[in-house]
Design a protein with these regions (language model features):
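A short core secondary-structure module
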Residues: 29, 33-59
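A generic structural motif
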Residues: 30-34, 124, 139-145
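An extended, acidic, His-containing surface patch that forms the Zn2+-binding/catalytic region
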Residues: 62-127, 131-132, 143, 148-152, ...
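A common structural junction motif
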Residues: 53-57, 155-163
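Short, solvent-exposed loop/turn segments at the edges of secondary structure
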Residues: 7, 15-21, 110-112, 130-132
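Short, hydrophobic beta-strand segments
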Residues: 24-27, 135-140
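The feature captures the short pre-catalytic strand/loop hairpin that immediately precedes
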Residues: 20-34, 231
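Short, small-residue-biased leader/transition segments that mark boundaries at the very start
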Residues: 1-3
Length: 267
């Protein structure tokens, strides 16, 4: 992570949230738009369900990786933000601190499972009542939370028998990789040599990676990008996705040193 092109922290992905996608669908016989039947309109049914989803927050669940993230991140911050990061590590976590951190999408993603509407599809003509309305809901599930719990929660949130919920991308659970000293130590040494003073921070990735397949094969996996990104300028999956050119070249130098270190050829 960087700020104003200056490295602030070096993250190591040791776990990732579980990717899952669901389809919410309501149907009706349709008709002409001059004779509306609001109580039967699939668009209204799905829209109301999405409003309920937008107002719901999944419970907070911290694991080894997310705890380490907030513990180390608190050392980088000052004032209220640093205090809030320490406060959520208490047992029980401070509710006011949770509310403030949850207001920031980046930190909220480290605290809980999230589900969000990403696509809508409804109707076939502007002068006809819709026969169907569909909404795609993408969820990022905490690695230690059973996906079945999330699917059941969606059913309770939707709370409408007229809406069918189907899984369109089946979740593949991905167990966290342990924070082993023999893994972190070489990374920390290389970071200290190249970016003095920049701390290494374990992170639970909110996105998805191929690491889940390796972890499910019993191979502990760690994501080491070495590409510093500004959290206020992340454009992943966008048409204008980009990284700093200098960050790219710095990363290739780091990767070369890292591969030599883990291959036993540090010099």
């Amino acid at each position: 992570m960087c700020s104003s092109d200056l490295p602030v922290s070096f993250t190591v992905q040791a776990s990732e949230k579980v990717y899952a996608t669901y389809l919410l669908e309501a149907r009706d016989k349709g008709g002409h738009s001059s004779l509306p039947r609001p109580a039967d309109n699939p668009i209204y049914h799905v829209a109301a369900a999405l409003v309920r989803l937008s107002q719901y927050q999944f419970p907070v669940r911290l694991n080894e990786i997310s705890r380490a993230f907030f513990e180390r991140s608190a050392q980088l911050e000052t004032g209220q933000l640093a205090a809030d990061m320490r406060a959520v590590l208490r047992n029980p976590p401070d509710r006011a601190a949770l509310a403030r951190l949850s207001a920031a999408p980046f930190y909220d993603s480290k605290l809980r499972t999230t589900c969000v509407a990403t696509m809508l599809d409804a109707g076939h003509a502007e002068n006809a009542l819709p026969q169907a309305a569909r909404a795609t809901v993408n969820c990022r599930i905490l690695p230690d939370q059973p996906p079945a719990q999330v699917a059941a929660a969606l059913g309770r949130i939707v709370a409408d028998d007229r809406i069918a919920i189907t899984t369109t991308y089946t979740p593949i659970p991905s167990p966290p990789s342990p924070l082993r000293p023999e893994i972190l130590r070489p990374i920390e040494q290389l970071v200290a040599a190249r970016w003095p003073g920049v701390p290494v921070v374990p992170v639970m990735e909110a996105g998805a990676s191929d690491g889940l397949f390796l972890r499910n094969a019993g191979i502990p996996t760690y994501g080491v990008s070495a590409v510093f990104e500004d959290p206020d300028d992340i454009r992943a999956h966008g048409k204008d996705e980009r990284i700093s050119a200098q960050s790219f070249y710095d990363a290739t130098v780091y990767w070369y040193g890292m591969m030599k270190a883990f291959a036993g050829r540090a010099n």
